[in-house]
Structures are given as C-alpha cells and as structure tokens.
C-alpha cells in the first residue's frame, strides 16, 4: 500500500526542506507543490553540484518522478520559464515530467509592481516580502478577479480580462503609490509568448493524485516557507500569503485530509527568521553571529541575512498542534559544533508574569515576551557528514533526546551536511 507524506517547515522557513524532499523522492512516484510561489528557494546539493529550485518541485532531479504544481500555488510564467531553462540546459527533461493545475493563479508584472510599491510605502514598517508579487496574486484569487493558468486557453478572453484588471492596478500604482504604470501590450506579449508551453503541461492534479493513491503509489507533498509564516496560524501580519501548514495540502492540491499518512516537520537544530516579525530566542551577540556564519544563513532567493537564535520548543509546539506532526527531521546539526553551551527555549515569560508553554498567535501578543531557557552542555567534536547516529558525540545525542522529550515528537531524520548523503534516516516516513 502506498504512503502519502507531507514534508513541511516547522519553523519560519529555510529549514532545509529541499534536501530532504530530494532525499525521499527515490521512494515516490509523485512530488507535489501545494502552496506558495517562487518566493522560497529550495537548495539541493547532489555530488557537490548546487541547484536552487523556487517553483518546480524538488523531485524534478529524479528521473522516475512526476512533479505536480497544485492549484494552491501562484505561478509566475516568467519564473517558470527561467527555471525550466536552467534545468533543461543541464539535460533534465522538465516538460514531460511537470504537470500544472489549470486553477493556479498567475503572477503577472502588475503584481510585482504593486508588491514593491507597497513595501516601499511602508518604509521601516515593511513586512519584508520578497517583492515577487505573491501577496497581490493571492489577493486577486480571493477577490475572484485574478487570471489563472486555465485562462490561457482562450487568448481573446484573456486579453480582455487583462485589460480590465490592469486598469484597476495602474490606477492605484500611479495615483496612490506614485509609481510607474505597467504596460498592457508588453505584459500581454510576454504571457502569450509562453502560453502554449504552459498549457501543454496542464492537468487535473487532484484526479491524478486520487488515482495514484488508489493504485498504491507513494506521494510526497512539498511545503514551502514554514508553519510560523502561515497566513492564518503564523505571526500575523508578519506572514506569507498562503497556508503553509498541512491543511494546505487539501485546499492547494485537492487531496483529502484523511489520506495523509505522515507529516514530517523539518526543523533546524537552532532557529532562523528572515524579515520582520517576532523572534523570541533571537541572539544579538557573538553567538548569534557565529551561528549565522557557520550556517551560511543567507536567503536562497533574496540573499538577505537571516536572524539567528536558539531552538524554540514553545513555537514548535504550535507547529505540532496545527500540523499533526508525526516526526521531525533535524537539519544543520553540525552548525552547533564547538559551542560550550547550547540552549533550548522551554517556556515564555509573558509581560504579566505568567508562564506560557505555547506561542501566541498574533504578532502583537509576542511583545515583551522573554524566553525561559534550559542550558545543555555543548560538544567540541566535529559532527559534519556523520551518517551513523552511534558515532555522534554523547552531548549531541543528549541534545537530540532532550528536544524529543520537550516536544513529544520523535526525530526521524538527522542531517549533518548539505549533500543528500550526509543524512541519517532513523525512521523512514514511507515505511511507517
């Protein structure tokens, strides 16, 4: 009987999902993206060769895998063509192995222009978006005015819809944000130049998945960003514009929730965050700088430096409850090599003096929150590239065990380096 496994970020994104998805895809027939857009980069290193995927599922590097982009993904034709070109130049057959839902909202130049105009207007109160038009595209979807992949089949109607929506956007860009208008003909020409390529890959993703499940095929759902950036369950308003939690699989790919067998939450051995928003365990000292240096903590898409801090078990508990996480994969364990002490946040001291074991929902409720730490001895040995858990230093194993105890979730996979071989699978999600 086949298994359906969700791989998602349990923190604020950048946990190393791409490597783990790639690692597990030798077991699956389908890899599915179900939310987000090209705003999150999934970095894979295979035999020393680096690949950054932003939109196409990470399974594309496995020849036997079919990749699906579900309706919950906002799709930029420009980004898709660029990524396809990069992969095809390396001999990877994308067009015959990538299928796209006709219900995917399109990201077009006016979305990008609006995204950048808004962030500029907010100044130092900016949310910290990637400026790739993700939020405005989701707005159009909810407002039921957006153009979708399926609209590309009728070019005359597409052109008419585009004119109406561009009038709406340009009025705001010019008169409210004092920005340049987006050119209608240029936008239309750019989309039509690639429309036939995209429509040739259109398929009924939900039905494909249902048939695959009934046949007993293994399916992997690849999440983007992280749980604490979920539009509903994250630190609002410092969140992304999609549902990054496991529930997004049902709404973003048309896959029934009862058919999900395992949810693998990806966690770093510490915490990072890009952009604004609450971060209780953030470090502003030399320790934080050293974690950032050793972990090479810069965004795969934006290049922005990531904020770094100790592991936050309180925030993780919210991820566990909202995702029904079955097991964790801990990445970047080797980054903590050499520290004399390592801390785990096990509680929050609220401004009123109360102790909280679960993270607040809204960003405003995090103000004045202080972390309550448990300190563990570190280790001086090198763990980089270790693939046998018994070869890990005793203090490393104690740290892992303590995180399991505090969170109540077992660690199924350990990653000690960026390459797919630098991994320990303690409990295979597809074998459970």
Swiss-Prot record:
Per its UniProt record, what InterPro entries does this chain match?
Adenylosuccin_syn_GTP-bd, Adenylosuccin_syn_Lys_AS, Adenylosuccinate_synth_dom1, Adenylosuccinate_synth_dom2, Adenylosuccinate_synth_dom3, Adenylosuccinate_synthetase, P-loop_NTPase
- Manner of cofactor binding, per the entry note: Binds 1 Mg(2+) ion per subunit.
What the record says about family reads: Belongs to the adenylosuccinate synthetase family.
Annotated binding of GTP, by residue: 13-19, 41-43, 306, 332-334, 415-417
Q: What does this protein do?
A: Plays an important role in the de novo pathway of purine nucleotide biosynthesis. Catalyzes the first committed step in the biosynthesis of AMP from IMP.
Q: Which GO terms describe its molecular function?
A: adenylosuccinate synthase activity; GTP binding; magnesium ion binding
List locations, semicolon-separated. Answer: Cytoplasm
**What reaction gets catalysed by this protein?**
IMP + L-aspartate + GTP = N(6)-(1,2-dicarboxyethyl)-AMP + GDP + phosphate + 2 H(+)
The biological pathway it contributes to is:
Purine metabolism; AMP biosynthesis via de novo pathway; AMP from IMP: step 1/2
GO terms under cellular component? cytoplasm
Q: Which domain of life is it from?
A: Bacteria
Which species is this UniProt entry from? Histophilus somni (strain 129Pt) (Haemophilus somnus)
- The gene coding this protein: purA
User: What assembly does the database describe for this protein?
Assistant: Homodimer.
Tell me which UniProt keywords the record has, alphabetically: Cytoplasm, GTP-binding, Ligase, Magnesium, Metal-binding, Nucleotide-binding, Purine biosynthesis
- Residues the entry annotates as binding substrate: 300-306
Q: Which residues form the active site?
A: 14 (proton acceptor), 42 (proton donor)
Listed name of the protein: Adenylosuccinate synthetase
Q: Which residues are noted in the entry as Mg(2+)-binding?
A: 14, 41
Q: Which positions bind IMP?
A: 14-17, 39-42, 130, 144, 225, 240, 304
The keyword Magnesium is annotated on this UniProt entry:
yes
Q: What cofactor does its activity depend on?
A: Mg(2+)
Question: Has the keyword Flavoprotein been applied to this entry?
Answer: no
Record-listed E.C. numbers: 6.3.4.4
Its main localization is cytoplasm
Q: What's an example Gene Ontology biological process for this entry? A: 'de novo' AMP biosynthetic process
């Amino acid at each position: 009987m086949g298994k359906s496994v969700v791989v998602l970020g349990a923190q604020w994104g950048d946990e190393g999902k791409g490597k783990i998805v790639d690692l597990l895809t030798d077991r699956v027939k389908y890899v599915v993206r179900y939310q987000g857009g090209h705003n999150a980069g999934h970095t894979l290193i295979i035999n020393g060769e680096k690949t950054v995927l932003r939109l196409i599922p990470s399974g594309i590097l496995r020849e036997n895998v079919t990749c699906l982009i579900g309706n919950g993904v906002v799709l930029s034709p420009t980004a898709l063509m660029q990524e396809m070109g990069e992969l095809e130049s390396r001999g990877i057959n994308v067009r015959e192995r990538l299928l796209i839902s006709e219900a995917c909202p399109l990201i077009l130049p006016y979305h990008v222009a609006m995204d950048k105009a808004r962030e500029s207007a907010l100044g130092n109160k900016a949310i910290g978006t990637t400026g790739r038009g993700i939020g405005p595209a989701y707005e159009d979807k909810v407002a039921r005015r957006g153009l979708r992949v399926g609209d590309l089949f009728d070019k005359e109607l597409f052109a008419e819809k585009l004119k109406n929506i561009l009038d709406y956007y340009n009025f705001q860009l010019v008169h409210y944000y004092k920005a340049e208008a987006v050119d209608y003909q240029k936008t239309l020409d750019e989309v039509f130049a690639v429309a036939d390529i995209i429509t040739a890959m259109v398929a009924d993703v939900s039905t494909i998945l249902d048939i695959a499940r009934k046949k007993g095929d293994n399916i992997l759902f690849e999440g983007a960003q992280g749980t604490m950036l979920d539009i509903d369950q994250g630190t609002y308003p410092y969140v992304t514009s999609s549902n990054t939690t496991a529930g997004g699989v049902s709404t973003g790919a048309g896959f029934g929730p009862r058919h999900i067998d395992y949810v693998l939450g990806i966690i770093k051995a510490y915490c990072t965050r890009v952009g604004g928003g609450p971060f209780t365990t953030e470090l502003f000292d030399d320790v934080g700088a050293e974690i950032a240096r050793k972990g090479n903590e810069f965004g795969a898409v934006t290049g922005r430096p990531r904020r770094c801090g100790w592991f936050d078990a309180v925030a993780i508990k919210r991820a566990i409850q909202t995702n029904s996480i079955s097991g964790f994969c801990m990445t970047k364990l080797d980054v903590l090599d050499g520290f004399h002490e390592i801390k785990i946040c096990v509680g929050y001291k609220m401004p009123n003096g109360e102790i909280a074991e679960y993270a607040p929902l809204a960003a405003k409720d995090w103000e004045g929150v202080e972390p309550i730490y448990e300190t563990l001895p570190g280790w001086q040995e090198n763990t980089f590239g270790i693939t046998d858990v018994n070869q890990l230093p005793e203090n490393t194993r104690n740290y892992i065990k303590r995180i399991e105890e505090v969170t109540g979730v077992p660690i199924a996979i350990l990653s000690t380096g960026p390459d797919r071989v630098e991994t320990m699978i303690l409990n295979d999600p597809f074998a459970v």
